[in-house]
């Protein structure tokens, strides 16, 4: 019997795909039976394969599942105090700010170092099985601030990459300990910035691949996109660095623009203006800048490493006085006629520096490197003054002097001496009419041993010297004044370089309360020789006139001192 175009056959039986005109009932029955057999076979095979695969997978994972269960059970019952007595720790940490794709190193550019230490004694563990273990590096959340933690707590703070991003920490993330020390020499780097975290920072973590030591955790640090590396601040800055490399000065910002308008383009320019006129520099950056910001900028600029071979000299208006500056115009030393002046009064130094800073066009560079160690070889001074007064006989004479603003004369030069010769103090006069001197009163009692006055013969290069001795007594004009009275017989002849006695000479020393010093006056000089007499009279008039002028200016500035 053939079935042709039967409606019942073409109904919802599911066999409409067969061509009815070629099928017979017998064929249909055979087809159905064969399909049922195939379905049953496939079902049976599927169940069998599932069972086999399940058994094999369970057999393969059984060791891992059992150790994981044991570890989980241990972590539930574990407390921070019951953990291993060994721990990992970072000896150094990355800088406070790094960039994506950049190798993670310490602040000074050295590799990061991890050590295995004893948690009790905090000493290095250089022996034992754990001293040669493998360490795994992981990225941590910066909010992980607990002082002690469990394994579960540490793993919970391990960060993973954002969706669609590469692994957060890339590179060689394993380090082998050697004698308990591991050095991270591989190029490990973060592939993403830290702006998406709550704290906007990362930490670097380290843990043993097997259990046995407490994990390590670095300090927190920010990670910015690599395109911001061109705006990176330099620590320490170089003198030639652009000024925006300093902290708190943004590139193309307001402060950088203002500084550029004043030709302050580099860190060296910044340091120079700070030395010469820091108030002006502060006003350029902005009078409204906070004190904290200002201190941060200055502190960073002061970290600049200067070139010690770059020096400048300034020849002062006072003949013979030369100032030596470093590359940012900071005063190094003061020299007179090639000799360094030590322990010069601060007001005098301030006056000399102010003069130099007002005449920056007269500051010249020194190209000779030997000048730094031996400035006296390069400092050229004018001829010696025509009149010299020298006081000797004391080991600790602190005879100091300063300059009158209206004068170009040098007031004092400290004369170097050997260990066997008492130091001399040289008071120099030129043709100017004013000069002033003072001596520390604590050394005054030792000053009475001798007093020497010399006049230099500019034509023959010879000097006449007279020496006196005397005592101390009160002066009726001033209760704080003293007088040296010298009484000696003068020899009949004089020759250059010899000592000659003086008949009578008065040296008046007046105390000044402001500095606790003594002003020196010469008066009532009576010498046996006309040449020596003229020498003394000239000294008396010059010095007394100078001190009267100084006292008048001092009283005008401080009216109370004149009362």
Curated annotation (Swiss-Prot):
Pfam families for this protein: Calmod_bind_C, Calmod_bind_M, Calmodulin_bind
Similarity comment text for this entry: Belongs to the plant ACBP60 protein family.
Keywords: Abscisic acid signaling pathway, Activator, Calmodulin-binding, DNA-binding, Hypersensitive response, Nucleus, Plant defense, Transcription, Transcription regulation
Single GO biological process annotation from the record: cellular response to hypoxia
Phenotype of gene-disrupted mutants: Reduced basal resistance to Pseudomonas syringae pv. maculicola ES4326 and P.syringae pv. tomato DC3000. Impaired systemic acquired resistance (SAR) induced by P.syringae toward Hyaloperonospora arabidopsidis Noco2. Plants lacking both SARD1 and CBP60G fail to accumulate salicylic acid (SA) and to express PR1 and SID2 upon both biotic and abiotic stresses.
Cell compartments where the protein resides: Nucleus
Domain of life, per lineage: Eukaryota
Single GO molecular function: DNA-binding transcription factor activity
Quaternary organization: Interacts with calmodulin (CaM) in the presence of calcium ions; this interaction is required for defense responses. (Microbial infection) Interacts with V.dahliae SCP41; the interaction is direct and inhibits CBP60G.
Job description of the protein: Transcription activator that binds DNA in a sequence-specific manner, 5'-GAAATTTTGG-3', to promote the expression of target genes. Recruited to the promoter of ICS1 and other defense-related genes (e.g. PR1, PR2 and EDS5) in response to both biotic (e.g. Pseudomonas syringae pv. maculicola ES4326, P.syringae pv. tomato DC3000, and microbe-associated molecular patterns (MAMPs) such as flg22) and abiotic stresses (e.g. UV-B, drought and abscisic acid), thus triggering rapid defense responses by stimulating salicylic acid (SA) biosynthesis.
Expression sites (tissue/organ): Expressed in seedlings, roots, leaves, inflorescences and flowers, and, to a lower extent, in siliques. Particularly present in guard cells.
Chain spans, region Calmodulin-binding: 1-76
Matching InterPro entries: Calmod_bind_C, Calmod_bind_M, Calmodulin_bind_N, CBP60
Single GO cellular component term: nucleus
Name this polypeptide is given: Calmodulin-binding protein 60 G
Region of interest called DNA-binding, as start-end residue ranges on this chain: 147-263
């Amino acid at each position: 019997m053939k079935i042709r175009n039967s409606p019942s056959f073409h109904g919802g039986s599911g066999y409409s795909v067969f061509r009815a005109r070629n099928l017979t009932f017998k064929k249909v029955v055979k087809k159905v039976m064969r399909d049922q057999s195939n379905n049953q076979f496939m079902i049976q095979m599927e169940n069998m394969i599932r069972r086999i695969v399940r058994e094999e997978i369970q057999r393969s994972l059984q060791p891992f599942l059992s150790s994981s269960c044991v570890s989980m059970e241990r972590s539930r019952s574990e407390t921070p105090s019951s953990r291993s007595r060994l721990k990992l720790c970072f000896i150094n940490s990355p800088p406070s700010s790094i960039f994506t794709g950049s190798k993670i190193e310490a602040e000074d550019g050295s590799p990061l170092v991890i050590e295995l230490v004893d948690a009790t004694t905090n000493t290095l563990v250089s022996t034992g099985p754990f001293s040669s273990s493998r360490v795994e590096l992981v990225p941590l959340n910066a909010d992980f601030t607990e002082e002690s933690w469990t394994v579960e707590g540490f793993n919970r703070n391990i960060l993973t990459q954002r969706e669609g991003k590469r692994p957060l920490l890339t590179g060689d993330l394993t380090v082998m300990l050697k004698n308990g020390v591991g050095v991270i020499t591989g190029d490990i780097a973060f592939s993403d910035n830290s702006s998406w975290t709550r704290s906007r920072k990362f930490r670097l973590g380290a843990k043993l691949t097997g259990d046995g030591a407490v994990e390590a955790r670095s300090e927190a640090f920010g990670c910015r996109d690599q395109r911001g590396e061109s705006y990176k601040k330099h620590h320490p800055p170089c003198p030639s660095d652009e000024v925006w490399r300093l902290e708190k000065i943004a590139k193309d910002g307001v402060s950088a623009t203002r500084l550029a308008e004043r030709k302050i383009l580099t860190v060296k320019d910044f340091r120079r203006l700070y030395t010469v006129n820091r108030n002006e520099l502060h006003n350029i950056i902005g009078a409204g800048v906070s004190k904290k910001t200002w201190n941060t900028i200055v502190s960073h600029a002061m970290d600049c490493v200067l070139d010690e071979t770059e020096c400048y000299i300034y020849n002062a208006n006072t003949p013979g006085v030369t100032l030596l500056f470093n590359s940012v115009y900071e005063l190094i030393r003061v020299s007179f006629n090639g000799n360094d002046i030590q322990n010069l009064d601060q007001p005098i130094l301030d006056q000399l520096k102010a003069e130099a800073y007002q005449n920056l066009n007269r500051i010249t560079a020194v190209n000779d490197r030997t000048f730094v160690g031996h400035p006296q070889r390069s400092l050229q001074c004018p001829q010696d003054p025509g009149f010299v007064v020298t006081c000797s006989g004391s080991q600790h004479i602190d005879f100091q002097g300063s300059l009158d603003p209206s004068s170009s004369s040098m007031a004092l030069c400290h004369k170097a001496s050997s260990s066997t010769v008492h130091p001399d103090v040289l008071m120099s006069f030129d043709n100017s009419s004013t000069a002033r001197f003072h001596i520390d009163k604590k050394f005054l009692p030792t000053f009475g041993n001798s007093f020497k006055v010399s006049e230099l013969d500019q034509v023959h290069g010879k000097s006449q010297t007279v020496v006196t001795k005397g005592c101390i007594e009160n002066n009726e004009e001033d209760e704080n004044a003293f007088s040296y009275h010298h009484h000696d017989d003068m020899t009949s002849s004089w020759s250059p370089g010899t000592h000659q006695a003086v008949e009578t000479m008065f040296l008046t020393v007046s105390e000044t309360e402001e500095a606790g010093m003594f002003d020196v006056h010469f008066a009532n000089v009576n010498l046996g020789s006309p040449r020596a007499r003229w020498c003394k009279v000239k000294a008396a008039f010059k010095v007394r006139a100078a001190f009267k002028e100084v006292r008048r200016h001092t009283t005008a500035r401080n009216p109370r001192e004149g009362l």
